[in-house]
Design a protein with these regions (language model features):
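Single-stranded nucleic acid-binding surfaces, predominantly the OB-fold ssDNA-binding core
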Residues: 1-108
Length: 108
């Protein structure tokens, strides 16, 4: 059986994207997409990472509050905090990102 970890996510950028370097030296763009679901309109936050030219485009074009659609795959990451505590995390590795127009770009 093949495992499938494809993701399609639509939401709004929670904050401006940040750039970092992966352990293997690759430049990457990290951002958080917020979606609102359910009757209670509870927000969910998803970490997304984009590499290469896509990452550069995201860093340049994305701003907090902008709508995005991300197509990607799931990847498990982990980190250790200064106290030595292990923190597992699931991130979305972006393979395609669509940028929604900002209100100012739509003439609103």
């Amino acid at each position: 059986m093949n495992d499938l970890s494809s993701v399609l996510l639509e939401g709004v950028l929670a904050e401006d994207p940040k750039t970092s370097t992966s352990p293997d030296g690759q430049a990457r763009c990290n951002f958080i997409v917020t979606t609102v679901e359910g009757r209670k309109k509870e927000p969910f936050h998803f970490g997304v990472v984009a590499y290469g030219q896509l990452g550069q485009k995201c860093l340049y074009d994305l701003k907090a509050g902008r709508g995005v659609r991300v197509v990607g795959r799931l990847r498990r990451e982990s980190s250790t905090d200064p106290e030595g505590e292990y923190h597992p995390e699931i991130k979305i590795v972006a393979e395609h990102v669509e940028f929604r127009p900002l209100k100012s770009e739509r003439g609103e």
